[in-house]
Amino acid sequence: MHKGTFHMSRLTDTLAAKLEEAGITQAELARRVGQSQQAINNLFAGRAASSMVWRELARELGIDEQEMRQMMTEAGRDPEKVTSLAGLRKYRAVLPSPREPFPIIRQQEHLPRPNATIGEETNMEPRKKKLLPVLGEAVGGEDGEYIFNGSVLDYVDCPPSLENVPNAYAVYIDGESMVPRFRPGETVWVHPTKPPRRGDDVVIQIHPDNEDDGAPPRGFVKEFVGWTANKLVLQQYNPTKKIEFTREQVVSVHPIILAGKYW
């Protein structure tokens, strides 16, 4: 067994054993630590090596804090590293800025004068890495339903193709309705202003059945087939079937431009 796989197995095996000892479900654990069930499932399934709420998880499961940190570090990620958006901003605030001018090299008399000049010195600020919010709380079911209530589940790195796209976001794939195209636990990155084309994978949002009770839009990840005169037509892979919504039901159709566990 690969060393990293062994360490990840130690983490996931310990979490599973402690959860069973505690007599609670992943859903209940997620509720107690203020995380989505998807985020907790990613950790238990080995798709994530750490969590922003690792101390709370250790406390709820009766794991020594130092042991918890050690297992996560062995699995490939030190939980003490800055990973949250607020933490990243705090980290950037203390980065030194190269404000000292570059040293000037004096022209020596015996050397020929250069026939080109160097431009004025500029204050080179460190490039700030953009993060995108992960939206859509998984509901589950055969169709892989989500709820888009505005809650941010996590933050992920922004790919270059979305750096200048306002309101771009990501979604964690849940369920198997789009296997083999997407598998549970993968991340998809979404372009909210690009028109979808036939064959594109998309994130769609649908008005709730009863908007009067203030329910948020429902969402799905499907393949875009097209529009008819009065319907949106989509394709699902597993089980294979066509899905249709009336135009009045549709809130948005956003194409997925990138997918994978890592990019």
UniProtKB/Swiss-Prot annotation:
UniProt DNA-binding residue ranges: 26-45
Signal peptide location: none
Sequence ranges assigned to domain HTH cro/C1-type in this UniProt record: 15-68
Keywords: DNA-binding, Early protein, Repressor, Transcription, Transcription regulation
Lineage top rank: taxon: Viruses
UniProt cross-references to InterPro entries, sorted A to Z: Cro/C1-type_HTH, Death_dom, Lambda_DNA-bd_dom_sf, LexA-like, LexA/Signal_pep-like_sf, Peptidase_S24_S26A/B/C
GO BP, sorted A to Z: signal transduction
Pfam families for this protein: HTH_3, Peptidase_S24
Gene Ontology MF annotations: DNA binding
PROSITE patterns to which the protein is assigned, alphabetical: HTH_CROC1
Protein name: Repressor protein C
Organism: Rhizobium phage 16-3 (Bacteriophage 16-3)
Gene (name only): C
